[in-house]
Amino acid sequence: MKWIWLITSAFLLTVLKQPALAQEESPWAETPELTLSGYLGVFYSYDINQPTTNTKQPFFYSYNRHNEFNVNLAYIGLSIDQAKYRASLKLHTGTYANDNYAAEPGVLKNIYEAYAGISLNKRNNLWLEAGVFPSHLGFESPVAMDNWTLTRSLANENSPYFLTGAKVIYTPSDVVEIMGVVCNGWQRIQMVERNSLLSFGTQLIITPNEKYSMNWSTFVGTDEPDYSRRMMYFSNLFAVMQFTSQFGLLAGFDIGMEQSAKESEKYNTWYVVSAIARYAFTEKWAASLRGEYFDDQYGAVTYLEKLDNGLRTSGVSINVDYMPVPVVACRLEARWLRSPDEIYPKNDSFVKDNVFFTISLEVKLDKKLL
């Protein structure tokens, strides 16, 4: 009887301890990393044409000021990163926030990121995220330090920087990442009034090694009320090739179509070609050369009051970067745009060419608190 009692007691103790052990060993119970992030980018820009207003062009939404010092973007936020869940909340201000969030009401203008995500499987290669998050469209970030050029390319300025919705991210291997998203519209936090149709997008990233990557992203949706709904279809394709530790090349091609009217079979098409070459002279000094062409002559995503139509222009820029440490950047850029139309303000008239210079000072910090 004594042996039976001992065996029974040991069995009960083992069973009772299982939940506690399972809880202790569960990846959900692991302590997450908590990171405090901050960024500040100040700039001065001067337009040779000397426009009569302090904004340069209606199709720019970053660094779009003339002959003044200003803050393009400043944010502060917290992020949580754990094996099974993650989240980020960042609040921002600056001319970028003012221009890109012009359609958003009240305090929504101050949301840079606000999203949460959870892992959907044991391998943690299938994730669901929801909230306000960076757009999958484009090869540039609002944070200039993350980009090869100081100012934003025409392709990125006229496609979404952020989306609001939910997305599923699947990473079957180190080479491939697949994403699907449903969102409130083309760079929207709050949906357009009386629009009952959500928008959709996809992304495919192929990274065969550290030197090369290819990204193909799409968007399907509308940004208009139901009674005037015009469908939009957009494709964003680019590749990054880091040939050596010093020299890299980026090439991109965007094309989109929007219905000319509700239920119309006619579409207004726009496209953008972009190329950027970057050379790092040392760990602290680098330079980039950009060439681009933007054609939206029917005004699908741009509108020029003078033409009562859209933008057609080509452009070239060169920038020099000095980074004394990885968290600080001093940058200078010269940029030239030329259009077949006289669209660029010069004093009280319009010309075909636009030349402007931009300098910036940026600081970006990430501090782990846990």
What does each model-found stretch correspond to?
Residues A22, D47-E68, Y96-E113, N121-I205, ...:
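Surface-exposed coil loops of outer-membrane beta-barrel proteins
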Residues P27-K56, L128, Y212, V355:
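Transmembrane beta-strand segments of Gram-negative outer membrane beta-barrel proteins
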Residues T31, D81-A83, N121-R123, S135, ...:
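Outer-membrane beta-barrel channels and translocator barrels
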Residues P32, N67-N72, V107-Y112, P160-T164, ...:
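Residues that define the transmembrane beta-barrel architecture of outer-membrane proteins
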Residues G38, V42, N67, V71, ...:
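Residues on the lipid-exposed face of transmembrane beta-strands in outer-membrane beta-barrel proteins
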Residues G38-Y46, L89-T93, A130-V132, G180-N184, ...:
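Transmembrane beta-barrel strands of outer-membrane/channel proteins
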Residues V175-I178, N195-S196, T202-G310, S314:
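Detector for outer-membrane/organellar transmembrane beta-barrel domains
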Residues Y322-P324, V328, V351-L370:
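Outer-membrane beta-barrel "beta-signal"
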